[in-house]
């Protein structure tokens, strides 16, 4: 579809959001879809599904430093619609976001849910995946792997599963970072995969030191944590002489483009880097 997305706001469909400049501000738009059996478990609490649907979209706005204005919901009727509505009310209230409209349908098969989030950015340029430069340092706002442990706990029916069920959109951190970063995105599909994507978009090579990455898993599962998604931390680059204005860990440095977009401890990582759509 990239050939159809010729408007500058579409950013070539290579970013997580469209950015439409309106005077001195920008309208930021994003749309994500959750599919039962892929993005959430069959039989999972509909209130948690509603939370995840909203939070994952708001996380895209966070990576642009945008203030949420509202959401539009595409809802396929399910087995417990009142419970979904209760969860939707909870997450919208938590983030101070309004439901502006949408559509409701009935259909057979796995439940498919879509949400469009609209936000406002007051700084220019609005961050994108591209923009990282040779000499920049690579940062992440917090540990990865918590969602992996949460999913395993949910599947086992025992333990702490909040990180998977109810991810957090780091809106305040994104707003504080946006004026300073050279590039930024949220980690939704795995740190290694998303870092590789950012490097490719920026035409550089990311060199990440494995031991510098904060993880929520035991050390023996570090590799799993680096490749698992759903953590929604913010991954960003700053000029080499800049410190992060929010709590974050420096995990590597940006080099000029080499044969591989990503190096892990000096070597291209092997195997699957994360969740491929």
Q: Language model features by range: what are they?
A:
Residues 1-55, 59:
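N-terminal glycine-rich phosphate/pyrophosphate-binding loops that anchor nucleotide-derived ligands
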Residues 7-9, 17-18, 89, 100-106, ...:
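A generic local secondary-structure boundary/capping motif
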Residues 10-12, 20-23, 64, 105-110, ...:
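Solvent-exposed alpha-helices and their adjacent loops that cap or buttress functional pockets
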Residues 23-27, 34, 67-150:
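Glycine-rich anion-binding loops of enzyme active sites
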Residues 46-70, 83-94, 172, 176, ...:
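Small-aliphatic-rich amphipathic alpha-helix that forms the alpha element of a beta-alpha
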Residues 77-100, 105-113, 118-121, 179-180, ...:
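Glycine-/charge-enriched secondary-structure boundary and capping motifs
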Residues 133-142, 166-191:
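Internal active-site segments that recognize and position negatively charged phosphoryl groups
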Residues 146-166:
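Short, compositionally biased
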């Amino acid at each position: 579809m990239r050939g159809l997305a010729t408007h500058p706001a579409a950013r070539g469909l290579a970013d997580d959001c469209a950015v439409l400049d309106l005077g001195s501000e920008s309208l930021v738009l994003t749309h994500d879809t959750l599919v039962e059996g892929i993005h959430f478990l069959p039989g999972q609490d509909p209130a948690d599904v509603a939370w995840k649907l909203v939070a994952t979209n708001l996380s895209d706005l966070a990576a642009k430093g945008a203030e949420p204005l509202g959401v539009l919901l595409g809802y396929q009727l399910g087995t417990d619609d009142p419970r979904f509505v209760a969860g939707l009310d909870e997450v919208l209230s938590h983030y101070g976001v309004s439901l502006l409209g949408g559509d409701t349908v009935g259909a057979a098969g796995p439940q498919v849910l879509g949400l469009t989030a609209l936000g406002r950015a007051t700084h220019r340029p609005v961050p994108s995946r591209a923009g990282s430069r040779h000499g920049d340092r690579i940062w992440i706002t917090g540990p990865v792997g918590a969602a992996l442990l949460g999913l395993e706990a949910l599947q086992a029916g025992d333990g702490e599963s909040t990180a998977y069920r109810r991810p957090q959109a780091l809106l305040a951190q994104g707003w504080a970072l946006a004026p300073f970063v050279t590039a930024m995105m949220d980690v939704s599909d795995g740190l290694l995969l998303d870092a590789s994507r950012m490097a490719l978009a920026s035409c550089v090579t990311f060199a990440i030191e494995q031991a510098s990455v904060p993880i929520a898993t035991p050390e023996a599962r570090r590799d799993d944590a680096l490749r698992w998604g759903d953590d929604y931390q913010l991954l960003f680059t700053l000029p080499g002489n800049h410190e992060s204005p929010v709590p974050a860990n420096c995990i590597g440095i940006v080099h000029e483009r080499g044969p591989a977009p990503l190096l892990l401890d000096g070597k291209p990582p092997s195997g699957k880097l994360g969740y491929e759509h």
